[in-house]
Regions:
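A short loop-to-beta-strand structural motif that recurs across blades of beta-propeller domains
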Residues: 92-96, 134-136, 174-176, 214-216, ...
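Repeated scaffold domains used in trafficking and secretory/extracellular systems
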Residues: 58-65, 111-121, 153-164, 192-204, ...
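Conserved Ser/Thr-centered positions that define the repeating blades of beta-propeller domains
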Residues: 97-98, 161, 307-308, 358
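Beta-strand-rich domains and repeat architectures in extracellular enzymes and scaffolds
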Residues: 52-84, 89
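Short glycine/acidic-enriched loop and turn motifs that connect beta-strands
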Residues: 78-84, 129-132, 254-258, 298-300, ...
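C-terminal motif of bacterial Sec signal peptides marking the signal peptidase cleavage site
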Residues: 20-21
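Blade-level signature of beta-propeller repeat domains, shared across WD40, Kelch, NHL, RCC1
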Residues: 326-362
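A short helix->beta-strand "capping" segment at the edge of beta-propeller domains
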Residues: 27-58
Length: 362
């Protein structure tokens, strides 16, 4: 009998020891702080698809642009059928938050599909499509969207790299630099650099490009070319770091056609090595200076890894309570990210999609 009672404290002690040891090995997830989770029900105040689903089910976010530390833009497609079963089409929409993701307002756009953002400090170029393509200029200060062009879907009209005032523009025959503040002012790209990738910079008509392995600037207004920087090393490409609106970099590439042996070295314009890209880190990485975020491990148990020293040391955040099923992310410097989280709570009002804001904790 005494032995029978002795086993209970022993069993209890073993359980406590086990749970304590487990907690010691449970990853600590205080390296990110989720500061906002926006529910589209707050905007629409109704369920959709005949009352069966949260309003977020009708919104497909295809692009995220973060303008500054508090202004977030979501480019999306709104399924109008969800609100009215007789309207069988989608509408391109822009959602704007000025309080770091706590609330949003909707700006309807022409077209059925949201295609792209091109972000600068003062303006964004937005493209949507449907029966036609629509080009918008979004003012980051007034938060107003102005349609500046409507064209056919044959892609003969093309808007490209943008420095906040001047933008690369093609009509299918010739390539120009357009002054977005006065769109009647267009400067044709010179034949001497016609086949060289060029990028507007400085908001004064300057184009920067790599020629004969050196960097040059040509001003489309003065029509003068000057040597910008004589490079010490040889480079294969002069391109934006990741997306079209990211910083320009010098790139050296090895084994470009071999996925296993592929290697890409990224340098800034001072020829300082930033990082190396290979098969292991080629996709779903965001970079800002020495900061890297790996958001490739998505799904029902997503993980977000980030590093503040070019990937030498990593922190891993194990996302709890919601899933991340799409790779649509937006980042603000090395401070926070925005993405869509899915909460599975059955018929509870807590179920459905939310626009999440996660702050990185250094």
């Amino acid at each position: 009998m005494p032995q029978k009672f002795a086993t209970k404290p022993l069993l209890f002690l073993l359980i406590v020891t086990f749970l304590t040891s487990c907690s010691m090995f449970t990853p600590k997830d205080n390296n990110m702080k989720w500061t906002a989770q926006y529910n589209f029900m707050d905007l629409y105040n109704q369920k959709v698809y005949e009352g069966y689903f949260n309003a977020g089910a009708a919104i497909e976010v295809n692009g995220i642009a973060i303008i500054n530390s508090h202004t977030i833009l979501l480019g999306a497609e709104k399924d109008l059928r969800a609100f009215d079963p007789e309207i069988l089409e989608k509408q391109a929409v822009l959602f704007v938050s000025t309080d770091k993701g706590k609330t949003y307002k909707e700006i309807p756009l022409e077209g059925n599909y949201f295609d792209s953002f091109y972000k600068t400090e003062d303006y964004c170029i937005i493209e949507t499509s449907g029966e036609h393509r629509f080009i918008y200029l979004f003012n980051n200060k007034t938060l107003k969207a102005e349609k500046i062009d409507e064209c056919d879907n044959d892609l003969s009209i093309w808007y490209g790299i943008f420095d906040g005032r001047y933008i690369m523009y093609s009509n299918g025959k010739n390539e120009y630099v357009m002054d977005i503040s006065n769109r009647s002012k267009m400067y044709e790209k010179p034949k001497a650099i016609k086949d060289i990738p060029t990028y507007p910079i400085n908001q004064n008509g300057d184009l920067i490009y790599m020629k004969n392995n050196d960097l040059y600037i040509y001003n489309v207004i003065s029509q003068q070319e000057k040597l910008y920087k004589k490079l010490k090393n040889k480079y294969d490409y002069f391109l934006p770091i990741d997306e079209a609106d990211s910083p320009l970099t010098l790139q050296q590439v090895k084994n470009e056609d071999d996925e296993e042996k592929y290697e890409e070295k990224i340098y800034n314009l001072d020829e300082e090595l930033l990082y190396v890209i290979n098969k292991d880190n080629r996709r779903k990485h965001y970079r800002y200076n020495n900061f890297i975020c790996d958001y490739s491990a998505l799904g029902t148990s997503p993980e977000i890894r980030f590093s503040y020293d070019y990937g030498k040391n990593w922190k891993t955040h194990h996302v709890k309570g919601f899933s991340i099923l799409q790779s649509t992310f937006g980042f603000y410097k090395d401070e926070f990210l925005v993405t869509e989280g899915i909460f599975f709570r059955g018929n509870s009002p807590e179920s459905g999609g939310r626009i999440m804001v996660g702050e990185f904790q250094k």
